[in-house]
């Protein structure tokens, strides 16, 4: 908004907040690093502003060539309402240059990018309430060993970020919740935690995408977009489970279709109605209904035209 453009305007803005009133009335309730006894209220306000300006500059969220100005990273942080601590985590994603030196197989490169982006997302401050609770670890070890886990955790499961990763991967991989009685005790908490994760994660991955576009990191942008599509559909991109997006098709129906070599939405749309009925053991009319639903799915195409010689 341009309201704050130097230290003095920052102090003026902060002086109009409730924090200023509280600092004046109860300064002992607000301990500041490096604070000195006897400092005036104005000096303490200046210390707060200077500290935060330095933090924003160190994290590349603020530039100060002539006057304080938000960078593209700072704009993304404001656009998607991302906390400062989370923004620092999102900006810690490694560029491709460092990964390509040690990884050469294309499919492995893609896996590393997806895993690194997912690993960064689950550390977000917005998810601090999603943590391990008493007796939950056995459940998450069971989920982690399921076939649908794209990136199973290979070390001991003990950190909250690992729990979050397992919940997201279980959702995207179509992993069914264990049916045993002990796991059932944690199902309600599992559903609540999943709701928290998916309530925030869409804007966080959009923030990652905008940052990677600004960095002109093509591979990281592509993989972030792939992860965003997966999170939006709640299934891994390019997975047969994409067919779950069609109403009336659940995990069991998808498994039957895959067994019959129908592995994608495109393949399903190319399948005749009577064969869909036969594969899914449905009555006449079900296949026609599925095909009519598929017609409403968007089909995106990109075309490229050469405009002249490229030197």
Regions found by a protein language model. Name each.
Residues 28-34, 68-70, 271-272:
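Short linear loop/turn motifs
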Residues 285-311:
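A structural signal for beta-rich interaction modules in eukaryotic proteins
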Residues 1-2, 11, 37, 41-45, ...:
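C-terminal helical accessory/scaffold domains
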Residues 73, 236-290:
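Helix-hairpin-helix
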């Amino acid at each position: 908004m341009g309201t704050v453009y130097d230290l003095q305007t920052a102090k003026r803005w902060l002086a109009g907040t409730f924090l200023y009133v509280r600092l004046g009335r109860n300064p002992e309730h607000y301990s500041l690093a490096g604070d000195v006894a006897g400092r005036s209220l104005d000096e303490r306000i200046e210390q707060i502003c200077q500290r935060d300006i330095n933090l924003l500059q160190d994290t590349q969220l603020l530039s100060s060539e002539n006057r304080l100005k938000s960078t593209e990273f700072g704009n993304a942080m404001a656009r998607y309402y991302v906390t400062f601590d989370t923004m620092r985590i999102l900006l810690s994603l490694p560029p491709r240059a460092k990964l390509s030196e040690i990884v050469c197989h294309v499919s492995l490169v893609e896996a590393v990018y997806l895993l690194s982006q997912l690993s960064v997302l689950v550390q977000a401050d917005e998810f601090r309430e999603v943590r391990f609770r008493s007796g939950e670890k056995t459940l998450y070890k069971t989920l982690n060993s399921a076939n649908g886990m794209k990136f199973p955790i290979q070390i001991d499961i003990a950190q909250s970020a690992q729990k979050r990763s397992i919940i997201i991967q279980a959702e995207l991989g179509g992993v069914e919740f264990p049916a045993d009685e002990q796991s059932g005790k944690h199902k309600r908490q599992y559903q609540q935690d999943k709701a928290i994760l998916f309530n925030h994660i869409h804007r966080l991955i959009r923030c990652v995408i905008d940052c990677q576009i600004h960095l002109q990191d093509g591979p990281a942008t592509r993989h972030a977009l792939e992860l965003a599509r997966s999170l939006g559909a709640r299934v891994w991109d390019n997975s047969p489970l994409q067919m779950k997006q069609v109403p009336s098709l659940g995990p069991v129906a998808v498994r039957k279709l895959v067994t019959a070599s129908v592995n994608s939405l495109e393949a399903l749309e190319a399948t005749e109605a009577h064969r869909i009925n036969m594969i899914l053991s449905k009555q006449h009319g079900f296949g026609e209904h599925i095909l009519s639903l598929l017609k409403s799915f968007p089909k995106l195409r990109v075309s490229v035209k050469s405009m002249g010689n490229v030197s």
